[in-house]
Amino acid sequence: GRGRWEIGIQGGVFSIFDFGAPSNDLVNADYLGGITFTYAFDSFSILTRIMHQSSHLGDEFLLNNEVERINLSFEELSVLLSYDPFEWLRAYGGTGVIVRSEPSNLERWSLEGGIELRPFTTSTKHRLQVLFGLDMRFWQQSNWQPDASFVAGVTLDPVGESSYRVDFLVRYYNGHSPNGQFFTERIQTLGPSVQLYF
């Protein structure tokens, strides 16, 4: 049969705060926005995305720390190919290229791949799935050193009622900081995550 086309819009604001400071200073905020084009056929799908990201340091953080501001922003074009051989397994991989950046000397290329396992699914009206996932990213700017993200948790997916989905996860990350101009620093984080999809 024929495949399916889908156009989507992505957006988000990701902020970090210094709760050790008297005024809970904003350290950094990343603003993301993009458009996605997806084509799905049988067990395969391909996603093409153009995304903009801009990062801004908090005013209090700049005043209280000797940090040189880098007005980091870029547009990236990426392509991901996904394969679902079974209902409980998905593997994906692809590449991205930065088409414009500030500063202009950022390396352009990146690779990404991962796997998702959903070994248990209820058949009730509100479908509940157990989820395990691994995502690996390699950026030329970081000399292709791996950034790894591991997740485990559950997904609530109301069957046949609406298109939303909620993920309740525990996430472990080991790699370069995803927070704006701190991308040269390696970090480790562990914490809960709640994600809502429409």
What does each of the following model-derived ranges do?
Residues 38-45, 79-80, 122-127, 161-168, ...:
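Short C-terminal domain-edge/linker segments immediately following a structured domain
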